[in-house]
Amino acid sequence: MSTTDDTHNTLSTGKCPFHQGGHDRSAGAGTASRDWWPNQLRVDLLNQHSNRSNPLGEDFDYRKEFSKLDYSALKGDLKALLTDSQPWWPADWGSYVGLFIRMAWHGAGTYRSIDGRGGAGRGQQRFAPLNSWPDNVSLDKARRLLWPIKQKYGQKISWADLFILAGNVALENSGFRTFGFGAGREDVWEPDLDVNWGDEKAWLTHRHPEALAKAPLGATEMGLIYVNPEGPDHSGEPLSAAAAIRATFGNMGMNDEETVALIAGGHTLGKTHGAAAASHVGADPEAAPIEAQGLGWASSYGSGVGADAITSGLEVVWTQTPTQWSNYFFENLFKYEWVQTRSPAGAIQFEAVDAPDIIPDPFDPSKKRKPTMLVTDLTLRFDPEFEKISRRFLNDPQAFNEAFARAWFKLTHRDMGPKARYIGPEVPKEDLIWQDPLPQPLYQPTQEDIINLKAAIAASGLSISEMVSVAWASASTFRGGDKRGGANGARLALAPQRDWEVNAVAARVLPVLEALQKTTNKASLADIIVLAGVVGIEQAAAAAGVSISVPFAPGRVDARQDQTDIEMFSLLEPIADGFRNYRARLDVSTTESLLIDKAQQLTLTAPEMTVLVGGMRVLGTNFDGSQNGVFTDRPGVLSTDFFANLLDMRYEWKPTDDANELFEGRDRLTGEVKYTATRADLVFGSNSVLRALAEVYACSDAHEKFVKDFVAAWVKVMNLDRFDLL
């Protein structure tokens, strides 16, 4: 029978020919907008982690809940768990020490210093893709082992804190003395969408180390935390892995000594698992059937657990005491000759050919084996620079212990930001340079002092544009990922920020504000910079006919140059800041995508981003003083002119350069050029979501709302790093 006859018969019976069989009628099914337009602007990234996804509600105060925690009891429960072997996932040598160290390490090790994203700070290991990464095989079991403890203590301890604390307790239980522990990591309730894990479509796709310097990626292969333990692209060559190791650990802000300490310390305890070929391993947690209840990688080999476990496919035990801290890693590394071999799963590894059988079997005390190592472990012996450090640690175990303690603390706390965010009884007293330390406050300005300072700033001769621009330059370095940057510390006045091209306004404005600070001696320079923005906005609002008081919270301090790591702060220099119409490079993403990226780092919503761009344009805050996007005949007035003129159909826009970065807006009737713009301006008229927001502020009744919304978003940015107010 023909298709026509089939359709006729269906219609004659009253059935719809297009909704039969297995059609998915569930919400979100079907072809999505991004399927049609894969380059669609990701405005949705600004809607992540809203209160709508948070079951605890916006009034939940984690710091307050943590203060109720019986911290000692929690650590006691974690210690007991380490040796409470469960039949569904038996512990190697009766201890989960190695498993929990790996869980903490792999949670923290996704951090990338280049953009501040990744890391352990939000408990992302619970969600895809990290919960199902090839490098995280079996960590689902570690998290499940922790569940009874999380259930017991509830919201007094976040998953994010619990993961790292479990790693610390595991180290301590092995006899190691850790540097300390700072709690304060707050859970989120959905995967991070903003992290660029790479554009590869297949797991374990190899990346050249040089490529890592051009993108914010933390691993040399998709789905790994760091490097391939078998060497680059399974080469089996220890020396060739050195560049990859330096690139990945360097992307976390680690130097060679920290890198050696972390690799050796992490491989002093525990083992890898490769009892048989990976073909025995089932689907990862995200792909596993519903009855698996979030557990993945079920193995069909033998019992699938214990001695039959398959994780990385490597079968390596590094030391004679895999549950107790020692210096055996370095002793074995240099004492024996190593021969390349393969694990039972076929993975490349090395065996100490001239060593006796001194390594205990994890499940049969009557058995021993030879020491084994990963390809990348031997890099620490054969790379000349790594070898020098390794030999020093071999001969000075205490130096190794100290280096690992500090490097582990840095690894697990790197994305937490300043020490002011740390809570708990084990926070170290020592300030560390990578924490961006700040001095104690010298000033406590009164309300009268603030009024007098505002008057002095207003009389200084600075323009509205200059006052607003310098405040933005100071505060907008903040990164929501690792909580670095911001106005507190006045590092705008220090190297390297004072020399950035985007901060050209600082050379004109800072001398005026510095002189004012010295003359009045009532507030820090950091406070005065932010207060200058307050004065500028209040003047601009008044010029627009709106009287408003911009909230200001004093208490910022001024950092010293010796408290500022120039190399690490250089990573905060923007390649683009659409709020100031700045673009340094054209080979990285689109201008509008980088605007979204900047807004997301500033934790802004789409409406907040929109109102800030519109307001800053009419206040003339472009980094170079250009008129791009200044769609107003009255600059310095906090008006809605940017939106009204952008959406005005009297103007037709055309590119003026081959890169389609600059545009002219001409009068459709006369052909006269009225305005110029960048992509960061025109996106608010071209993108359907942003246009909808722009229309709100372009309406005739939006003026007062616009000013209030602008002030609220502005104050949010100015206070992003005020962790002292928590």
From Swiss-Prot:
Gene Ontology MF terms in the entry: catalase activity; heme binding; metal ion binding
Cited InterPro entries: Catalase_peroxidase, Haem_peroxidase, Haem_peroxidase_sf, Peroxidases_AS, Peroxidases_heam-ligand_BS
Cofactor note: Binds 1 heme b (iron(II)-protoporphyrin IX) group per dimer.
Cofactor or coenzyme needed: heme b
One GO CC term, this protein: cytosol
Catalytic reaction list: H2O2 + AH2 = A + 2 H2O; 2 H2O2 = O2 + 2 H2O
Subunit architecture: Homodimer or homotetramer.
Task performed by this protein: Bifunctional enzyme with both catalase and broad-spectrum peroxidase activity.
Protein name: Catalase-peroxidase
